[in-house]
Amino acid sequence: MPSRLPRTPLAWALTLMLSACSSVPERPAPDVPESWFHAVREQPADAEALADWWQQFDDPALTQLVRRALENNRDIRLAMLRVDTARAQLRQARAGLFPTFDLPGSASRQWIENNNEPNPDSPIGEFVPDDDVITFDSWELALQATWELDIFGATRARTDSARQQIRSAQAQAIAARLAVASNTAQGYVQLRALEGQRALLVEGIELAAGLERIARALFEAGEVTRLDVEASAAERASLEADLDELDINLAKARLALDTLLAEPPGSTAHQLTTSARVPLAEQAIPAGQPLDLLRRRPDLIAEAAQLEAAQLQSLAARRDMFPTLAVQAAVGRSGLALGDAFSSASNFARLGATFGLPFLDYRRRSAAVELADVEGESAYLGFQQALAEALEEVERSLVRIDGQQRRLTSLRTTLRHRQLAYELAQKSYRLGEANLNEVLDAQRGSLQARQQVLQGRTALATAQVALFVALGGGWEMDPNATQSIGGSGL
C-alpha cells in the first residue's frame, strides 16, 4: 500500500490559508414587484411632496407642530448620538491602518551584596567598588514605532464595515425623524378628532336640553306623560357623562403631543385653537414603484448597510487567517552605571520585523469566520423581513385609503338622511304627530351619523399619514448619499 505523506506544520498552514481564500457567501437579490397590487393608478413618486408631506394637509398648525417636534424631540437627539458613536468607531478602526508611535522609558537600580575581597590583579577589579553593597543603575528612553502591515486587507475590511455602520446609524436617525413626524401628525389628527367629537357632544347636549324643555312644557300642558320628561332628562345626562370621559381623552392627547415636542405639559393646550377640522390631503398621493422603497425608506437603507457591514466583517474574519507582518523601529538613548566607579550613556537605533503564520489556535479563527457568516445571514434575513414589512405597509395603506374614501362618501350620504329625519321628527313632535321616543331615536341617529362622518374623516387622514410614511416620506433624499441595494452583497 502506498504510504501517506505526513502532515507537516507547513501543510497545515497551507490548508488554513486555502480555506481562508474562500469567498464571502453570495446571497440573491431581493424579489421586488414591478408595481403595486392595490394601486388605483400608477403614478411616479413626487419626491418634493414626499419630503415635506405634512404640508399636503394644508394645515399651518400641523406644519408648525411637526417642525417643532423635529427640532426638539429627544429620540432624534439620541439617534444623532448613535451616529457620533459610529463615527468614533470608524476612527478607531481606521487607526489600525497607520503606525503607532510610543515614547517608552525605563529606569532601574539593583543592589548587590559584595562579599568578595578586592583583587587588584583582576581585569575588572579597578571597576568594581569595594563597598559592601554595589548599586547597578540602568535607564533607557526611546521613540518607538510599530506598524502592522495590512497586506491582505483585514483592517481595511473592518474600516469599510465601520463606514457602513455610520451609514446605518445615519439612516436610523432619519427613520427616527420620520417616526417623530408621523407620531406628531397622528397625534394632531386624533386631537382634532376628539375636539370635533366634543363639539358634537356639546351640540347634542344643547339639543337634548331643548328637547327636555319642550317635553316639560308639554307635560305641564297635559299633552304628554311624565315618562317623556324623564326620558329626555336621561338622554341629556348620558351625553354629559360621555362629554366628561371625552375630556379625559382630550387631555391625554394634548399631553402626548407635549411629550413629542419636548415641551412642558399644557403647552399644546395653550397654543392650539379648537376651531380646526381634521385635516385631509386633498391631492392624490402618488405611490411610485415598489423599487423606490429601496432608495427612500431609511429603515431599508439601514438594514442594507447593516448587511454590507456584516459581509465586510465576514471578509475580515477570513483575512485574519492569512499571515501577518509587522515592522518595529526605535531610536533613543540608554545608559548604565556601576556605583560611583563606572557610568556610560549612548544613542541606539533598532529596526526589526515580526512574521506570524496561523498554525494551531484550536479553530478560533475558523469559528470567527462561522460566527461572521451567521451574523451575515441574520442581517440578510433582517433585510428581507424589513422589505416584506415595508411592502405590506404600503399595500395596506393603499387599501385603507381607497376603502376609507368610499366609506366617507357613504357616511356623508347617511348623514344627510339622518339630519332630514331628525328635522321631520322634531316638527312632528311639536305638532303631536310623533312621540318622544321617535324624536330621541332620530336625534341619536343624527348625532351618531355626524360622529361616524368625523370618524371616517379621521380614519382617512390617519391612512394618508401612514401611506406618506410607508413610502419613505419626510426627508430629502440625496441620491449620492445612498448606495443601491446591489452594492450590499446581495
Each predicted region: which residue ranges?
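Charged, alpha-helical scaffolding/interaction elements associated with membrane systems
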Residues: 72-73, 221, 431
